[in-house]
Regions:
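Cyclic nucleotide signaling catalytic output domains
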Residues: 94, 107-111, 116-168
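A structural signal for short, well-ordered beta-strand segments
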Residues: 25, 75, 115-121, 182
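Conserved long alpha-helical elements within nucleotide-processing catalytic cores of c-di-GMP signaling
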Residues: 1, 5-24, 31-58, 68-77, ...
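Residue-level recognition of strand-loop junctions within catalytic nucleotide-signaling folds
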Residues: 78-82, 100, 124
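A short linear hydrophobic-aromatic micro-motif
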Residues: 63-66, 181-182
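Short catalytic/binding micro-motifs of nucleotide second-messenger systems
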Residues: 58-64, 94-111
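Active-site core of bacterial EAL-family cyclic-dinucleotide phosphodiesterase domains
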Residues: 12, 16, 160-192
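Short glycine/proline-enriched coil/turn segments at helix->beta-strand junctions
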Residues: 18-24, 62-64, 122-127
């Protein structure tokens, strides 16, 4: 059990789905949570985590799914009953709307903190936590409210390319093989 939110934790999720190869899950990430911590402090950030956990717990009862706090500001909804793609998609769309600029009243500060979420969805995939994580990363990268994992995402190849170019650039910088080119910027009067 997660001590802060009293929700099940990642270990419980892994135990709950270990025998179910094709469970559907949604990873839920609170957008710009670091900004909340920096602006209001960690204790207020914790209050936001607790409130989001309460909302997700109530939401999970409506759809008969399980809710978990995985780590930090990431939660998970898991459907082990195989409600199907369309029903799970309906759940996701409703959740995305529910958290669109969701005001959370923080009584201790007498303020509303507005929260948005991004979701990564894995529907009936093997390694559902991993594939939902890939989908979450893709949603965040493309500034989407949610993304549903599909097998067309070839992340291994993408990661290999990224690693290749990262090493190539590091080596070029280290060996002083980078030649910078500059172009002067002029205003309309041709002043630099």
């Amino acid at each position: 059990i997660d001590e802060l939110t009293n929700l099940k934790n990642r270990t419980a999720l892994e135990d709950d789905i270990k025998d179910d190869d094709f469970v559907s899950i949604a990873l839920i990430d609170i957008d710009s949570f670091d900004d909340i911590n920096e602006l209001y402090g960690f204790s207020t950030g914790n209050l936001v985590l607790i409130e989001v956990g309460k909302i997700l717990n109530e939401f999970s009862l409506k759809y008969d799914v399980s809710v978990y706090r995985i780590y930090g500001n990431v939660y998970c909804l898991a459907d082990k009953k195989m409600m199907g793609f369309f029903k799970f998609n309906e759940l996701i769309e409703e959740l995305a709307v529910l958290f669109k600029n969701k005001p959370l009243y923080i009584e201790q500060l007498d303020i509303d903190i507005f929260v948005n979420i991004t979701l990564g969805i894995s529907i009936a995939q093997e390694e559902s936590i991993k594939t939902a994580g890939i989908a979450l990363k893709k949603a965040k990268k493309n500034n989407l409210p949610y993304f549903v994992y599909n097998n067309d995402i070839d992340t291994k190849e993408m990661i290999e390319k990224s690693m290749y170019w990262r090493e190539k650039i590091k080596k070029a910088l280290k060996n002083d093989k980078v030649i910078p080119f500059y172009q002067a910027i002029f205003d309309v009067d041709k002043n630099i």
